[in-house]
Structure formats: structure tokens, C-alpha cells
Amino acid sequence: MKILKYEDEKYEVLVQNNVFIKDKKSGEYYKNSLNSLSDKQLLRFKMYKEKVSPKFFYLFLSFTALMFILNYIHLIKLQNGLSSVFYGWKMWIIIVIYFIMNIVLHELGHIYSLKFFGKNFDKVGFKLNFYVFPAFYVQLNETYMLSRNEKIIVHLFGLFINYLLINTLELINQFTFSSEALTMAFMLFSSTLLWNLIPILNSDGYKILLAFLSLDEYSRFKTNHWLVLTIQIIGIGLAVNSVVHWILYIVN
């Protein structure tokens, strides 16, 4: 089915696999099945024109995948050859600055990719996923009113910015500065990005997977699709496992 859109002063509605409704007054979002719309109602809808072509979308995915593969290959080589010792406070300063810069640019990537599609973010914040794992986040409720491909781009763009930046910096570093501190920062942040790609713990990988499969996460646990439930259970298991290990480490 083609992507359809309807908008008036009260509501914004997008139709793709499901019916997504934004109540402009309350700021609430709703999701209904396709059969909730009558043929008469569908006559009021217009074709939704995506801002990026399918060709550009797949080119974007391919380039991001290539950056990830090259990053991972280089990371494995470095892990086999670089010393794991942290040399003094200067290295720690570089690593901290490296992380802060990448975290800020990551969230800006989400924000400005959403703005590119004519939508706005809700808020930026800090939270504990499953009450254990710390994470910065940008609330992107307006992605509900984007097409599937556009949602994927928004959720992936933070990672795209990170891989583009750290791969470029590491390439320059290898041929010029040969700074072990920069390489160590590259290794640590690359490992962090791997966790963000794995579709668990409310990661970007998790949001990309849900967008790809046209699924959503609901606040009521039992309402969710079995795949979402499985991922949530794995997340709870990881959280419990981490807490137990931290307690054992402190006690011992």
C-alpha cells in the first residue's frame, strides 16, 4: 500500500502498514490498524512524498554498513597489537574529550536528521535503561509521522555521524600523529558503538529494528509483539546480571 497522509488543524495522520495519528492539541500519538479507516475517509488522504528516494536510502545504508565493517576490522587488528595500559592523566583527558564530542554529535545527528524531514524533537535527557544502564537520549516522538525509511535514517544518523568522524580521525591519526591516546579513544568508543548497534536495551539498533519491521514498543508489557517482548526480557536479564556482578564485586 502507498504511503498516505492527512492533516488538519487538529490531527496529523500517516498511513503505512498501520495508521499513526498525532493529536496536535494534546501532543499524544495513537496507532490503529488499516481497517480502522473507511473508504470514504481514505478519499481525504493525499500521497505522502518522501524526502529521500529509495536509491538514496539504500546508498546511505550501504555506506554506513561499509564504515562499520572497516571500523570493526581495524578495531580487531588494534586489539591484537596495541597496549591496553592507560598512560597517565593526559590520555584520560583525550579519551574523555573524545567521548563527550562524539556523544554530543551523536545526539545532534538524531536532532538534525529529524529536522531535515520537517519534524522536531521533544527533549534531550539522561536516563537509566532498565534502571541500571546509563544513557543519553533524544526523545523523537515525531518519527511516528515519518515513513519507515525516514524513521530508519533518523535512528541511524547518530551512528552514521560517529562512524564517519572516528574513522576519519583514526585514518588521519595513523598517517600523521600516531597518537596512542587517540587510538585508544577510538578503540573504546568503537566498542561502545557496537553495543549501541545490538538491538537490546533501547539502543539505536533496537529502534532501527523496530522501524524496519514496522513494530512499536508499548508501555503495557503484554501488548507488545513477541519479538519486542523477547528483546525486553533479554534486557531485563542483562540488567539483573549486571547488578549481581556489581554486588559480588563490591562484596569481594
UniProtKB/Swiss-Prot annotation:
Gene Ontology molecular function terms on file: metal ion binding; metallopeptidase activity
Catalytic residues in the record: 107
Keyword set, alphabetical order: Cell membrane, Hydrolase, Membrane, Metal-binding, Metalloprotease, Protease, Transmembrane, Transmembrane helix, Zinc
One GO term (biological process): proteolysis
Membrane-crossing segments per the record: 56-76, 85-105, 152-172, 181-201, 231-251
Cofactor: Zn(2+)
Residues reported to bind Zn(2+): 106, 110
Function recorded in the entry: Required for production of the modified peptide YydF. May process the precursor form of YydF to release the active peptide (Potential).
Family: Belongs to the peptidase M50B family.
Name of the protein described by the UniProt record: Putative peptide zinc metalloprotease protein YydH
Gene from which this protein is expressed: yydH
